[in-house]
Regions:
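Active-site beta-strand/loop microenvironment that shapes enzyme catalytic pockets
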Residues: 239, 254-296
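Compact, glycine/acidic-enriched structural inserts
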Residues: 204-240, 327-348
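N-terminal extension/subdomain marker
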Residues: 1-232
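Portal/gating segments that form or line small-molecule/metal binding sites
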Residues: 235-257
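Structural beta-strand/beta-sheet cores of well-ordered domains, especially the beta-sheet scaffolds
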Residues: 49-51, 182-184, 271, 308-314
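A generic local secondary-structure boundary/capping motif
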Residues: 171-176, 265, 272, 301-302
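Catalytic or ion-translocation cores adjacent to nucleophile or general acid/base/metal-coordination motifs
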Residues: 277-344
Length: 351
């Protein structure tokens, strides 16, 4: 059996770029709050940013070509008649935005905006939010080990029903993209061996060779020896997003991480990772990969090493205290229904 979680070649922005402006939240967030994305666009302005290479879902399907032609102010930017907003991205049709994304990706790859910072390795992520410090390891998964069909018992499985109609627009965005900017989080059931982790605080370089021996709390163990790793970034995140640090896991340490997760895979009983966030993004990656396999354009040997076979994800521990599981639905009691509906209508109109 091949490993389903593997090292990657990972790109980041060059050192001259403001990372606080470079980093934006996942594209499927704030889908009913246009003011949030307007503020992000204003804050980023003309600076290099991942805002320019993602498609916030709030804008999907909102502007047709005819509407764009009618509302354009002549500079390619639509004036919103109701709010007076003037934003570049709120004015684009889906096709225009996707073309812009693909072009900008190519530009970032050729003009030095992006550079490879990790070769055949991983990134250890430390994300501070209101709920605490969440740790993760970024690497590649094999999409042949994942399926969003609940009937398939794969190593990597979805945690929510996939809305098939949501996949085609995402496929259109992904299929010609030169780079991948994921927000997919996978959860591993890996109870933390606190005694072993506490014992390696202040660790020295040799402790990296012990990662493969860790049976429980792989991510937490790597974090405990983070001072032996090369720091890649350390920045505040915009719009109250918290703080983030990243460390390169390379060389022997990367080999040890691969071995540790391979051992976890062997003992998991056939279910290693659950998709905690980004279900539809990963379903889109899977769909693109299946389309490539069915295209007949590649030999079996070529498919084995095709880049679309893999997706970049962050592995997080299900046992992390910083993970909060909240219900999607809310029950309102003792309210006047008409007043409540009027309030909701007024709030939506503001958007």
């Amino acid at each position: 059996m091949s490993n389903c979680f593997n090292p990657a070649n990972i790109l980041l922005q060059n050192d001259c770029i403001d990372m606080e402006k470079w980093s934006v939240i996942a594209c499927d967030q704030f889908t009913s709050q246009a003011d949030y994305w307007d503020a992000v666009e204003k804050h980023v302005a003309d600076a290099p940013s991942t805002l320019n290479v993602v498609f916030p879902e709030i804008y999907l399907g909102t502007i047709t070509k005819q509407e764009n032609d009618c509302n354009s102010s002549g500079d390619g930017v639509k004036n919103d008649k109701e709010t007076g907003r003037k934003t570049k991205y709120a004015s684009m049709t889906d096709d225009e935005r996707i073309k812009y994304i693909n072009t900008t990706m190519e530009t970032y790859l050729t003009d030095g905006t992006l550079k490879q910072v990790v070769a055949d390795g991983y990134v250890l992520v430390e994300r501070t939010t209101e709920s605490g410090v969440r740790l993760g390891i970024v690497g590649l998964i094999d999409l042949d080990d994942y399926d969003f069909d609940p009937k398939k018992k794969t190593l990597i499985r979805a945690t929510e029903g996939t809305v098939i109609s949501r996949i085609p627009p995402r496929v259109k965005i992904r299929e010609n993209a030169a780079i991948e900017l994921p927000h997919v989080m996978l959860l591993v059931d890996d109870p933390i061996d606190r005694q072993k982790i506490d014992g390696c605080q202040g660790a020295i370089q040799e402790d990296a060779a012990n990662i493969a021996a860790v049976k429980h709390g792989i991510i937490e163990y790597v974090y405990a020896i983070r001072d032996t790793l090369r720091k890649l970034y350390d920045t505040e995140l915009m719009q109250g997003g918290g703080h983030i640090r990243g460390y390169a896991i390379e060389g022997e340490a990367a080999k040890q991480v691969t071995e540790a997760f391979a051992a976890k895979q062997e003992s998991c009983g056939g279910f290693l990772f659950a998709v905690g966030d980004g279900n539809h993004s990963l379903a889109t990656a899977k769909t693109c990969w299946e389309n490539i396999k069915k295209s007949g354009k590649f030999t079996e040997e070529q498919l084995k090493t095709h880049p679309a076979r893999h997706a970049l994800v962050e592995i997080c521990n299900l046992h992390s205290e910083a993970l909060e599981f909240k219900p999607i639905h809310r029950l309102l009691t003792n309210v006047d229904v008409k007043d409540m509906l009027s309030f909701f209508e007024a709030e939506i109109t503001k958007q």
